[in-house]
Structure formats: structure tokens, C-alpha cells
């Protein structure tokens, strides 16, 4: 190997292969390293073209030189010194070379016997070699020839070329290796065939120990016959050459009659060279089924690419394998299992207490089953069991006597849940649109009713609590332990849907009637002291404007009829003249929102979106650019109103939008506008149908200051005060027939608490700037609302 390459080339090749020097000559590792470095140095893989070219050149030279070296060892390598016996002579070694320098290492030779006897004596000194028989002593040295004999008709030595004559392999002479040959390797055409039953002796490969062929050929050459004799030979004695010394019985290559009967048609149709091939297998008479029986389709899961787990499975295979799986399925700890036969196959149905994937069960069964195997999960175990235990299926065995329906059903437990509808009705009845407020009420309802302090007092400001506590106590207990409290309250607070539906289905007169009815019901529940307090507010309003009851009636008519350009109302006057209090009372009575129109123009869109589904809106404290009173601050409110004339005019629908919601097209509701002494442009002035000029009245301000409860309880800003003013000054015929009875009842109630003369005394106290209830009711009796 040191002469294969020069020292420099050898070191360069090892460097390119990245191998240490001690691995030089290890062809296997060098070839593996060459393949790895080829992947790294190939130009298409990002390597160096020059290094790849150098590696290919050195490797090609190395392979060529190694090939030539091995070829040159054929006649000179071991002539003078046979392996492991170079020091001993020919007679001492127990074997002698033949004419082609071959030293016999084959089974049964003298050298083979001596070597193994020496080996056994090392371990057992008393070992004695078996006695030699006469036959074995005279038997020539045998050699097992392992290369194929490819001659189709070797009976005639003249038909076999000289280079294809049989030869013996010399283990002392290196043979050419195709793996390192520069030429492409030849495709092997040899096939292994069984050794004939009549062959005897150690060779059995078709060559005599003396170099002769079993077919009578001389074996002086080094080549083998091109083709072996046909397996089904008819002329056994002729082909065998009639030699008894070869160790083969005459006719040993004759075919078996059973093989002839099975392959008769095949042997007649095939060529002479095809007898070396394995005969084709016969087709199965009963092919494996492709799916479960159709009667089980409705009870099985047909999901293929799913990781879902199941507790019940059905395995379909052969009867023998199903019986084996029935005994070994204990890995999954089945609670129930049964073995069923169906036609030529079997089925294993089992249930487990834990869930498993179908792939896990199938993979386990496939380790024990080489025949067809199908496994699916059972979605309806009880129904599937009833089918597989009836005809045409046959139940073989089961680990317990059957399945029953009660094993799959539990007794229904009454699991009460929170009534979402009840919570939504509670919010709708009490006009609650704040989710947190609804949650607070319901958590408060979870307390015990008998020990509730709020219910025992029955205060007016707590009437929502003590009126609904007992009704919602049971549902509140479930709500207390519910995980979806916020979701329930958010849905209940979404009263916008019912309000929008009401706006579509009801007229504005009906909506006004409903609002008045709600106010009258609240007034009906007031006590005597609270009734006098609200009558004081009525007296204060009657002193605010001249003929105030008629003015209020006209305002309600304008806002209810909602005629374009005949619906908007303007309250204008100096500071502290009662504009804001009256506007707030109207919003409370009719239901609406107050808007800030003085904001920048880019924020007006969301501010106006608050007006969705409202009966009326109030533009509070609008500021203008030109003030009649120089002490007033200018603002952009009037300019914004001028730019939004089409919006609040009420002629066409406009798009109103809120945050996190889409725009909605609707008519903008009528508005009540309050402002100080600002100059209005003609375009804005034309949109107001009623203009009320307020003036400062010191006696009204003094009356409010002296009656603390009118301000603290916001009696002036309450819509119930305006509703009481209407029923106090108008007959019941003015109201809707549906609420005339309630109007009369509430009026009689207040008339019993306060006579007309007493009301006149209250009115006089207001006009004089005193406490409205002076000398009429003790202030300590007032109930805080």
C-alpha cells in the first residue's frame, strides 16, 4: 500500500479526506470519507471546484493503483509462504499445494482437521481426534465452489467457452474487487438454488477435489461454466457423468414429482434460462376485506387524521389473530371485551375506563398481527355490541355476561343554572343599562331575605332592591357561584335592542304615555312628607314662567309630534335663571341624553352618536362667538350647530355612530338647547320653533337656598315633578285613556295630602323667597330620596 501513491499525494489525499495517517489503506473508511467530502466540496453544494477536482484525481489514481496491486497478487503473492504455515514444510503442514498454487482451506481437508484439532487440544489436552475411516482417508481434498454455474447445457464440454470453465477459488490469491475497479460493476445474474438431496461429501458445489467437474468437464482452466444445468433434468445419468468418486448419487438433480405437477404449465411456457427464478405465488382464494361490514358503519368513527381519544374500539382481523389479541389486550386494561366471528374473520370489541387514540391501539395490534388488520373507534358502544352479538355475527367469548344500557347512563342530576332571561327582565323593568350596576344588584340579592336590612327599611331610594329581592333571591344564589357573571350582566344591560324595537313598533305618543305612566307609579308610592316636597317643586316651577303649565304642555306636544323645523326648543337667558333645571327635568321625563356641542369638530361624530334611539336630546350650555354679555366666554357651539343644520333639522336621516359599533341611519331626535345671551345666525335661529327667554328671579333662587332638600334630592331636575305639575293643573281628560284612571288616582292621593289652600300657601312662600314648606311641614320629616 505504501507504493500506491507517492508520499506527498498520500498525505494530500488523507488531508482532503480528513483522516488520520493510521487509517491509510482502510479502503472502507476511506471510501466513506470520500463520499462525505464529495458532498461538502461539490460546487453545486457551495464547495470549491479546485479542491473537488483535486480530490477526484487523487481518489481515481488511488483506486486504479489498488486495483492493479490486487490483480498483480494472483501468481506471486503467496507462492513461497502459505498463510500461517510459512515456517513449516509441506509434509509437516499436512497439506500440499496443487498445480495452480492453491493451498486447501476447505472443509474436510487435512489442514482443516489439523488446525481444529490443535485448537481443541488447547482447551482440552485429553481431546482426541475422531478416527479416520478408509473412505475419508482416500477421499481427495474437497472444495466448496460458491460461484454460480450458468451454462444452460453443460453436458457437452465443447459448448462451454474456455473462459467460462469451472475454476476453484484460491483463498491465498487476491481476487479482483468490483468496488474498487475503475470499470463499472457488472450486474450479478446468479441465483442461489437449493442443494440437491442426493449430493454427498463436503463440496456439494459441482467441482471435484481434483479439479474435475461433476458434469465431466476438465477443470484445468480458471473459469466456470456459463449456466448451471436445468433444475428439472430428465437425463440424470448422462448429465452427472457417471462418476461415483465425486460423492454425488446418480439422478440427484432429478425433479420432485410434486414440483412437476405444480409447475408443469409454468415450466412449459418459460424459456430455459427462467428455471432459476422463483415460481409465482398463487393468488389468495379469500382476499382480505377492505372495510368493516356495512351493518357497523353507523356505530364507528371514520376519522382518519384525528387525535381524538375514545374508550371503545373494534378490531377486525383473522380468527386466530383476534383470539391472540383477546388474550393480550390487557395492556389497555379493558373493562369489557368480547370475541366475535364474522364469516372467515374475527372481531375484538373492548371498552376501557380511560380513553386512547385509535393509532395507539392499532400500532399495538400490528406488532402481533401480520395479516390484514383494521381498527376503529366505536362511537355508540351499546348499539354496536347489540349488532355484533346477533346474526350474521357469532359471539365466541366475553369476559363478563354482556353489556346493559344502565351501564352507560347515569341518573339525571338536576343542575340548576342561572336564568339569564330573568336577569335581563330585571334590567329592562328597572331601566338599567350598566352591567356593573346589574351585577351589584344581583350579588346583593344573594343575601338572605329575612335578615336583609334594606328590605326591612323599605326606603324610597332603595325600592329597586326591596321590590325585587325576594323575587330574584333563588336566581341570585345561582348567580353568586356562576363563572359567567360579567357575560350575563353585559347581555342583560344590552337593553338597546328592546328599546330600538320599541321605537320601531310604537308611536311617539305611546312612548310618552309609557314614560308618564312610569312617573305616576313612582309618585303613587311617595309618602306624605315626600308628596309635600314634590308639590313644593311644582309651586316653584309655576313661578318660573308665566302660565308655565300651558307652556309645558306645548313643549311636550312639539317634542312628541316631531315635525321637521317645528320641533326644536331654545332656552336662552342669563346665568342662574333656571334653564338647565327645566331642560334636565324634560330629559328625565321623556327619556334622553345631554350632549356637549362645544367640543372640536373632529369629536362631534361620536358625541352625536349618543343620540341613537333617544326620544329627545339636550344641547347643554351652547356657546357662541358673539356674546351680548361681554362677560361670557366665546365658544364653537353655535358654529357647530350651524354646520350640523341638516343633522338636527329632522328632515332626513343621518348616520350616527358609536365607538366599537357600526354607523346607524336614523332621524335625529328633537332637541332642547340651552344657552346664555349669544347672538345666533339666521340659519340657526330658523331651526328653533319655540324660544323661551328666561330672566333671573331672585326670590326663586332664595327659595331654593332656604329649602335644602329641594336641591339635595334634585326635585327641580326630576321628571316626576313635571308629571305631578301636569296632573295637578289639568284634568284627566287631557291624558291618554289608558292612564286616565291612574292620573285620577294619583291626583286624589296628593289632594288628600295637600289641599288647594295649603298649596296656595306653598306658592306664596316661594314668591316671597322663603322655604316653600315654611310653617307647613317640619324639615326633619323630609325623607331623603
UniProtKB/Swiss-Prot annotation:
Swiss-Prot/TrEMBL keywords: Acetylation, ATP-binding, DNA replication, DNA-binding, Early protein, G1/S host cell cycle checkpoint dysregulation by virus, Helicase, Host nucleus, Host-virus interaction, Hydrolase, Inhibition of host innate immune response by virus, Inhibition of host interferon signaling pathway by virus, Inhibition of host JAK1 by virus, Interferon antiviral system evasion, Isomerase, Magnesium, Metal-binding, Modulation of host cell cycle by virus, Nucleotide-binding, Oncogene, Phosphoprotein, Viral immunoevasion, Zinc, Zinc-finger
Superkingdom, natural source: Viruses
Cofactor field: Mg(2+)
Motif (LXCXE motif): 142-146
Record motif Nuclear localization signal, residues: 279-286
Basic and acidic residues: compositionally biased ranges: 85-97
ZnF (T-ag D1-type) ranges: 415-508
Biased composition (Gly residues): 199-209
Residue span(s) of domain J: 12-75
Annotated stretches, region: Disordered: 74-97, 145-291
Modification note: Phosphorylated on both serine and threonine residues. Small t antigen inhibits the dephosphorylation by the AC form of PP2A. O-Glycosylated near the C-terminal region.
Pfam families: Polyoma_lg_T_C, T_Ag_DNA_bind
Residue spans binding DNA: 293-406
Any one biological process term the GO annotation gives: DNA replication
Modified residues (N-acetylmethionine): 1
Cofactor binding description: DNA helicase activity requires Mg(2+).
MF (Gene Ontology): ATP binding; ATP hydrolysis activity; DNA replication origin binding; helicase activity; zinc ion binding
Bilayer-crossing regions: none
Residue ranges, compositional bias (Low complexity): 148-161, 233-247, 264-274
EC number per UniProt: 5.6.2.4
Residues annotated with Phosphothreonine modification: 278
Assembly and binders: Forms homohexamers in the presence of ATP. Interacts with host HDAC1. Interacts (via LXCXE domain) with host RB1; the interaction induces the aberrant dissociation of RB1-E2F1 complex thereby disrupting RB1's activity. Interacts (via LXCXE domain) with host pRB-related proteins RBL1 and RBL2. Interacts (via C-terminus) with host TOP1 and POLA1 allowing DNA replication. Interacts with host preinitiation complex components TBP, TFIIA and TFIID to regulate transcription initiation.
Protein name: Large T antigen
Species of provenance: Murine polyomavirus (strain A2) (MPyV)
Lineage: Viruses, Monodnaviria, Shotokuvirae, Cossaviricota, Papovaviricetes
Amino acid at each position: 500500500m505504501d507504493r500506491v501513491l507517492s508520499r506527498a499525494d498520500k498525505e494530500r489525499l488523507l488531508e482532503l479526506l480528513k483522516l488520520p495517517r493510521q487509517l491509510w489503506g482502510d479502503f472502507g473508511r476511506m471510501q466513506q470519507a470520500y463520499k462525505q467530502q464529495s458532498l461538502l466540496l461539490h460546487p453545486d453544494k457551495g464547495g470549491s471546484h479546485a479542491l473537488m477536482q483535486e480530490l477526484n484525481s487523487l481518489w481515481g489514481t488511488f483506486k486504479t493503483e489498488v486495483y492493479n496491486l490486487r490483480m498483480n497478487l494472483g501468481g506471486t503473492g503467496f507462492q513461497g509462504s502459505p498463510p500461517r504455515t510459512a515456517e513449516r514444510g509441506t509434509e509437516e503442514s499436512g497439506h500440499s499445494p496443487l498445480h495452480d498454487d492453491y493451498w486447501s482451506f476447505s472443509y474436510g481437508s487435512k489442514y482443516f482437521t489439523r488446525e481444529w484439532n490443535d485448537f481443541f487440544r488447547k482447551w482440552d489436552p485429553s481431546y482426541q481426534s475422531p478416527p479416520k475411516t478408509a473412505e475419508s482417508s482416500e477421499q481427495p481434498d474437497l472444495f466448496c465452489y460458491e460461484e454460480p454455474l450458468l451454462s444452460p447445457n453443460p453436458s457437452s464440454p465443447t459448448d462451454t467457452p474456455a473462459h467460462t470453465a469451472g475454476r476453484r477459488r484460491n483463498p491465498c490469491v487476491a481476487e479482483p474487487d468490483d468496488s474498487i475497479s475503475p470499470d463499472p460493476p457488472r450486474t450479478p445474474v446468479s441465483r442461489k438454488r437449493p442443494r440437491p438431496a442426493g449430493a454427498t461429501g463436503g463440496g456439494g458445489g459441482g467441482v471435484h477435489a481434483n479439479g474435475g467437474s461433476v458434469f465431466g468437464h476438465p477443470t484445468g482452466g480458471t473459469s466456470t461454466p456459463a449456466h448451471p444445468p436445468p433444475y428439472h433434468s430428465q437425463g440424470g445419468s448422462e448429465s452427472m457423468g457417471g462418476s461415483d468418486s465425486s460423492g454425488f448419487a446418480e439422478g440427484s438433480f432429478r425433479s420432485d414429482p410434486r414440483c412437476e405437477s405444480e409447475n408443469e404449465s409454468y415450466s412449459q411456457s418459460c424459456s430455459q434460462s427462467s428455471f432459476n427464478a422463483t415460481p409465482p405465488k398463487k393468488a389468495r382464494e379469500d382476499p382480505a376485506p377492505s372495510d368493516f361490514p356495512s351493518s357497523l358503519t353507523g356505530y364507528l368513527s371514520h376519522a382518519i387524521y384525528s387525535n381524538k381519544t375514545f374508550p371503545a374500539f373494534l378490531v377486525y382481523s383473522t380468527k386466530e389473530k383476534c383470539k391472540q389479541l383477546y388474550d393480550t389486550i390487557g395492556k389497555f386494561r379493558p373493562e369489557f371485551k368480547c370475541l366475535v366471528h364474522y364469516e372467515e374473520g374475527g372481531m375484538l370489541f373492548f371498552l376501557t375506563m380511560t380513553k386512547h387514540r385509535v393509532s395507539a391501539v392499532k400500532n399495538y395490534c400490528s406488532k402481533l398481527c401480520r395479516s390484514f388488520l383494521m381498527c376503529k373507534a366505536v362511537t355508540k358502544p351499546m348499539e354496536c355490541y347489540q349488532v355484533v352479538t346477533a346474526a350474521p355475527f357469532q359471539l365466541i367469548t366475553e369476559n363478563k355476561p354482556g353489556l346493559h344500557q344502565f351501564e352507560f347512563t347515569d341518573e339525571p342530576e338536576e343542575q340548576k343554572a342561572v336564568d339569564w332571561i330573568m336577569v335581563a327582565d330585571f334590567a329592562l323593568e328597572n331601566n338599567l343599562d350598566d352591567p356593573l350596576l346589574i351585577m351589584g344588584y344581583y350579588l346583593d340579592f344573594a343575601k338572605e331575605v329575612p335578615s336583609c336590612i334594606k328590605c326591612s327599611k323599605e326606603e324610597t331610594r332603595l325600592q329597586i332592591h326591596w321590590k325585587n329581592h325576594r323575587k330574584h333571591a333563588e336566581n341570585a344564589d345561582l348567580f353568586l357561584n356562576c363563572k359567567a357573571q360579567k357575560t350575563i350582566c353585559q347581555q342583560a344591560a344590552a337593553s338597546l335592542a328592546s328599546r330600538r324595537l320599541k321605537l320601531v313598533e310604537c308611536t311617539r305618543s305611546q312612548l310618552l304615555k309609557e314614560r308618564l305612566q312610569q312617573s305616576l307609579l313612582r309618585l303613587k308610592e311617595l309618602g306624605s312628607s315626600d308628596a309635600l316636597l314634590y308639590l313644593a317643586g311644582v309651586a316653584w316651577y309655576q313661578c318660573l314662567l308665566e302660565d308655565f303649565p300651558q307652556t309645558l304642555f306645548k313643549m311636550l306636544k312639539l317634542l312628541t309630534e316631531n315635525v321637521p323645523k317645528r320641533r326644536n326648543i331654545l332656552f336662552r337667558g342669563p346665568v342662574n335663571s333656571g334653564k338647565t333645571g327645566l331642560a334636565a327635568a324634560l330629559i328625565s321625563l321623556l327619556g334622553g341624553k345631554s350632549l356637549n356641542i362645544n367640543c372640536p369638530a373632529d369629536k362631534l361624530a361620536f358625541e352625536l352618536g349618543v343620540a341613537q334611539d333617544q326620544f329627545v336630546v339636550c344641547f347643554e350650555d351652547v356657546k357662541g362667538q358673539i356674546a351680548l354679555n361681554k362677560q361670557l366666554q366665546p365658544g364653537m357651539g353655535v358654529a357647530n350647530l350651524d354646520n350640523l343644520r341638516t343633522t338636527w333639522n329632522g328632515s332626513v336621516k343621518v348616520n350616527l355612530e358609536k365607538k366599537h359599533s357600526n354607523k346607524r341611519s336614523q332621524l335625529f331626535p328633537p332637541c332642547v338647547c340651552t344657552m346664555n345671551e349669544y347672538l345666533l345666525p339666521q340659519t340657526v335661529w330658523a331651526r328653533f320653533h319655540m324660544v323661551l327667554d328666561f330672566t333671573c328671579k331672585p326670590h326663586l333662587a332664595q327659595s331654593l337656598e332656604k329649602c335644602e332638600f329641594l336641591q339635595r334630592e334634585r326635585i327641580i331636575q326630576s321628571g316626576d315633578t313635571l308629571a305631578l305639575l301636569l296632573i295637578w293643573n289639568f284634568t284627566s281628560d287631557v291624558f291618554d285613556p289608558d292612564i286616565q284612571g291612574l292620573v285620577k288616582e294619583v291626583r286624589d292621593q296628593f289632594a288628600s295630602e295637600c289641599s288647594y289652600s295649603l298649596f296656595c300657601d306653598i306658592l306664596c312662600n316661594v314668591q316671597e323667597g322663603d322655604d316653600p314648606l315654611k310653617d307647613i311641614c317640619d324639615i326633619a320629616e323630609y325623607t331623603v330620596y
